[in-house]
Amino acid sequence: MLASAGLLQTSLIWVAYAVAVALVLLVAIITTFTWQSPHERSVTVSIVAIVSLTSLLATVFLLPVDIALVSSTASAHLGAKKDWATPERIDGILLTLKVVYYTLYSFDALLCLIVIPFAYFWYEEYDEVEEEEGTSGAGARFWKAAKYTLGFVFLVLILFLLGFFVPAAGSGNGKHLDLDYFKRLLAANKGEKALTFGVGLLITLGTFLYTLYTGAGLALLPVSLIKSAPSISAPQLSATIATDLEHNRELQRQIEMRNAGRPDGISQKDRRELDALLREERTLVRRERLAAETRGDGRSGVFRAWTKIQAVFRPLKLLGGILLLLLSILVWASMLITGIDKAANSICKEHCGYILGHINVFQPVNWIFVQSAKAFPVDYILMALLVLFFFGSSITGIATIGIRFLWVRVFQIKKGRTSPQALLIATVMLALIILAINYAIAMIVAPQYAIYGTQTFCVNAPRHPGEQPDCREHRDMVRPCSEVFSEPAAKDVCTPTVMSTFLNRVTINWPVFGAIDFWAQFAFLGVFMVVFVTSLFRTPRLNLSELDEEAEVDEEEGLLASTGRRFGATWGDITGRAKNRNGYGTGGGEGSNGRG
């Protein structure tokens, strides 16, 4: 009966994970098709991007499952293992988790280093003219892409060989190795050591991207939601453009009338002015058409209804942005507290990647997770939402900053305008960033919860040798599990999560990775603070010249509005009527243009 109860609990956790992966697949599909350019869509690129994002998010979402499974083996109130949690059952649970982890990590590395580069070169080798003439077939295209991908295959082999043969830097003797927990971390075979080296290197590379893109996105995502309402309604924009267009055509008529009947034709000065007015007229006509599409003219009633629904729910986006802003500040403060605590109180400092024995200062995010774990499955839902928040922040950062080499923008990431090459590169960047997010959440954001979950142990001496300690009458003798406790009861009850063990194994075997990953968190906090303060005091403005360039590329793209009052714009979109505003116009030069 007890064994079946344990099986039921673990099965429910895996079922919840399967549901989460299904939702992750939906998120990956929506993300891919939202950002992909419809005119350059590639089936191969779309499939690779969707599979890659699904696999990477599934890897991160395995952390709540890991925590739930190890926590389910112990009673948090009594500090003892449950009756069904025999050593054999626990070993079976940990083995299953290891198999899933290693499979997903290996698959992620395969995607990032082989599959995605192959898809990139496969798309690059496509030539529409050669395809129509039949001079280039799929076979030739395949071999060209495979030839370029061989470089990444050699890179994978070199990484594996380095990890297999190079001695682990943390294998020397030291004071920090006296504890059994750290000895078990070093007790890894050659294959695991090679895998820890490869993953540690990928996490470190991802940490640099995470510091810049996720740090900026964590501040920009809430602010963008708060400032997301267009500053001028679509009806107001249409009225303004119509006025400017009428004024433009009136000036053209005046020039034509002024030069009518001249034997030598129109003067050079008037010709230059007329050409400028004609260019401006074409721009205004495009803006007028785009504004009409934004209003829903010529669209179905469903589209127009959806536009009005979006306008109605803009206040909810404002509220959601405020809540996410508070969450960002809470996460930032928690990470700062953990970082300072680890830097000051780590039991082994840089020798093991600043592993912290136990939390010495109140850490709000970790406390929230530990307390919410009492109401299953609230903590797992919160962890999933936190992962999605970091993931969404990373996308926001990449979209805002773009794909750059040093300070030069190579690719631009925009909704509905991202090229397949940019989408694949962004997918690799997200892959590396997600690995870094995995480290940050487990080691910095909620360290105690991510390592032992809700597990506790009883320090009361057992009545008979071989029995579990009994704290039913001594609840004050129940202690949270920690790496530094050496009591026999702690060794018997406390089971660390597979993820934390793997990450700690990376940092203790390769301390340079641990040191870089740890100190990069302070750079992450600095980037967040700079972007956060800047975005609060910087009024977003609309670059109409940029919109005109987009309109020339794709004249069917909807136009978001520019300057004015946000709440007046919202009401204008709901009612469908333009509000009179004297003195407003778009023809006053680029200096008067604004971004909504």
From Swiss-Prot:
InterPro entries in alphabetical order: LMBD1_LysCbl_Transport (IPR050854), LMBR1-like_membr_prot (IPR006876)
GO BP terms in the entry: protein localization to vacuole
Sites carrying sugar chains: N543
Gly residues bias locations: 584-596
PANTHER family assigned to the protein according to its UniProt record, in alphabetical order: LYSOSOMAL COBALAMIN TRANSPORT ESCORT PROTEIN LMBD1, LYSOSOMAL COBALAMIN TRANSPORTER-RELATED
Residue ranges of the region described as Disordered: 576-596
Location in the cell: Lysosome membrane
Keyword Transmembrane helix: yes
Function: Probable lysosomal cobalamin transporter. Required to export cobalamin from lysosomes allowing its conversion to cofactors.
UniProt main location, coarse: membrane
Assigned keywords, A-Z: Cobalamin, Cobalt, Glycoprotein, Lysosome, Membrane, Transmembrane, Transmembrane helix, Transport
Keyword RNA-binding: no
Stored Pfam families: LMBR1 (PF04791)
Descriptive protein name: Probable lysosomal cobalamin transporter
GO molecular function, one term: cobalamin binding
Family: Belongs to the LIMR family. LMBRD1 subfamily.
Membrane topology according to the record: Multi-pass membrane protein
Transmembrane stretches, start-end: 13-33, 45-65, 99-119, 150-170, 201-221, 318-338, 353-373, 381-401, 425-445, 512-532
GO cellular component terms, semicolon-separated: vacuolar membrane
